[in-house]
């Protein structure tokens, strides 16, 4: 190899000397011009030849790249065709991307597994806490039944007692409102009696009209045709009519208050019925409730029977 390079160097050196020296028959100036012209032509020819070679090489490179791509596709198709689940042929950079994606997926899977384990542990803690609360409720029911000297087979439910307590509180509030209404009516009747005692020298009908407390019969008598036609347009009659209108307005207001209290009572009773139905459904689902004629072990409170009796009596009175 070294001998070949040495021979190549000697030949190039000799050729370079010949080009520099040129034709010995020409004068030195002409010889230099001829040498330069020859060098220029040779350089142009060489450049042209090299340009053609570059084009040819570029064309061959494109063909080789196309053949390489086609060959890779053919190999991949053959691999996929030979196996049922073939392994795809990936390039180096694609394999790196896939490895990175696989690592990220593994990290996500590990994170999800950790979260799942934490959720399972939390669920187990909640179940244990629920069991402890259930045991506590059972113990409270037994203690409450023992305090109330109840029967062992009829344990009083705490939820039923709480529901009974809410119902009684609402009823107590309703009764307070009714007591206040009755007190206002009593005060009005007292004022009417005082005015009646003080109004002397007037007839019975006019005094009744001025009291502000009228019965249905008194109103019908005052508004009858005989009294209406024979009623003179005097200040006394106008005052009686004003008193009658005031009494009617007060009576209407009282009736409205009674209706409102009745609606509130109906709402309380409706809520009570809904709570009892919910309690019965809960007992039915838990297996503690049975068909009529059979007994169940959990009591819903002694106040419930009183409430049912009261509800039946109220429905009979309404209808």
From Swiss-Prot:
<protein>
    <recommendedName>
        <fullName>Coiled-coil domain-containing protein 149</fullName>
    </recommendedName>
</protein>
<feature type="coiled-coil region">
    <location>
        <begin position="259"/>
        <end position="286"/>
    </location>
</feature>
<keyword id="KW-0175">Coiled coil</keyword>
<feature type="coiled-coil region">
    <location>
        <begin position="1"/>
        <end position="199"/>
    </location>
</feature>
<keyword id="KW-0812">Transmembrane</keyword>
<dbReference type="Pfam" id="PF09789">
    <property type="entry name" value="CC149"/>
</dbReference>
<keyword id="KW-1133">Transmembrane helix</keyword>
<feature type="transmembrane region" description="Helical">
    <location>
        <begin position="298"/>
        <end position="318"/>
    </location>
</feature>
<keyword id="KW-0472">Membrane</keyword>
<dbReference type="GO" id="GO:0016020">
    <property type="term" value="C:membrane"/>
</dbReference>
<comment type="similarity">
    <text>Belongs to the CCDC149 family.</text>
</comment>
<dbReference type="InterPro" id="IPR019179">
    <property type="entry name" value="Coiled-coil_dom-contain_pr_149"/>
</dbReference>
């Amino acid at each position: 190899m070294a001998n070949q390079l040495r021979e190549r160097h000697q030949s190039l050196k000799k050729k370079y000397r010949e080009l520099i020296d040129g034709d010995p028959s020409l004068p030195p100036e002409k010889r230099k011009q001829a040498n330069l012209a020859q060098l220029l032509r040779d350089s142009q020819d060489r450049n042209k030849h090299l340009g053609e070679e570059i084009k040819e090489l570029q064309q061959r490179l494109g063909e080789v790249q196309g053949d390489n791509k086609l060959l890779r596709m053919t190999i991949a198709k053959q691999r996929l065709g030979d196996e049922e689940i073939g392994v795809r042929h990936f390039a180096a950079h694609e394999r790196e991307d896939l490895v990175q994606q696989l690592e990220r997926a593994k990290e996500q899977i590990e994170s999800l597994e950790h979260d799942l384990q934490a959720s399972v542990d939390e669920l187990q803690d909640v179940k244990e806490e629920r069991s402890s609360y259930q045991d506590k409720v059972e113990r409270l029911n037994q203690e409450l039944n023992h305090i109330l000297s109840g029967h062992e087979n009829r344990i009083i439910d705490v939820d039923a007692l709480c529901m009974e307590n809410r119902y009684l509180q609402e009823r107590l509030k309703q009764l307070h409102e009714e007591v206040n209404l009755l007190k206002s009516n009593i005060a009005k009747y007292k004022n009417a009696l005082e005015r009646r005692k003080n109004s002397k020298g007037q007839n019975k009908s006019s005094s009744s009209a001025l009291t502000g407390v009228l019965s249905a019969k008194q109103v019908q008598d005052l508004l009858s045709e005989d009294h209406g036609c024979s009623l003179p347009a005097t200040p006394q009659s106008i005052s009686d009519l004003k008193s009658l209108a005031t009494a009617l307005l007060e009576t209407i207001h009282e009736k409205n208050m009674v209706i409102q209290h009745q609606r509130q009572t109906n709402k309380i009773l409706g809520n009570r019925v809904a709570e009892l139905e919910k309690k019965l459904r809960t007992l039915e689902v838990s297996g503690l409730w049975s068909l009529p004629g059979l007994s169940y072990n959990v009591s819903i409170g002694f106040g419930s029977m009183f409430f049912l009796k009261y509800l039946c009596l109220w429905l009979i009175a309404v209808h």
